[in-house]
Amino acid sequence: MDTEQAEIVALKALTFLASDTELIDRFAAQSGVAPNDVIARAGDGEMLAGVMDFLLSDEAVLTDFCAAHDIDPEHPARARQNLPGGDLPHWT
């Protein structure tokens, strides 16, 4: 997966979060970014990375997202690796 494909997955995740008031509010509370600002920064790779971190931190939300968009459950983690800060080595 390349950066462009990763950004597409992350934008789908952002759309998924934005469509659910509870989820976007949880993301806003955790990130410290107002919901409107999250949407406005949709083109920001660091914001998209944060969206993916949030998605990957909750298995139920991740599963719902993958089902809603017919995405392989492994794709979000691969997408995250191709966004800013995702190239960190795994030590496990």
Residue ranges and their predicted role:
Residues 1-92:
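Metal- and O2-centered redox machinery and metal/ROS homeostasis
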